[in-house]
């Protein structure tokens, strides 16, 4: 089964993403902080990381830098409530970027696309 890690400091977002992605057949773990995400990434193998950019404490971009150094090849989808980052995301070494929304169609589509791309 494909395993995803969702990292967001907002509990409601973590639960929503986990529920929706689980319904699509993925095994989903969640983390509410960079420290929790780092611990899970050391303990388990993941096929995809869904990562909020702006979090209290360690930011999503700081976590992304660690992932790029330590877990080369792990695909990452960045999420944020702000559309203003969209033009810059390609320089952040992420595979995709989505704007948070109550409609998770874009997130689900990007999860499928990124996973398919990395399985080739």
What is each PLM-predicted segment?
Residues 33, 59-62:
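Acidic catalytic/metal-coordinating carboxylates
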Residues 52:
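Active-site residues of response regulator receiver
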Residues 39, 61-72:
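Short amphipathic alpha-helix used as the core "switch/output" element in two-component signaling
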Residues 30-48:
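Acidic, metal-coordinating helix/loop segments flanking the phosphotransfer/catalytic sites
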Residues 62, 82-100, 105-109:
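Alpha4 helix (beta4-alpha4-beta5 surface) of REC/receiver domains from two-component response regulators
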Residues 14, 56:
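The feature encodes the CheY-like receiver
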Residues 15-23:
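Charged docking surfaces used in two-component/phosphorelay signaling
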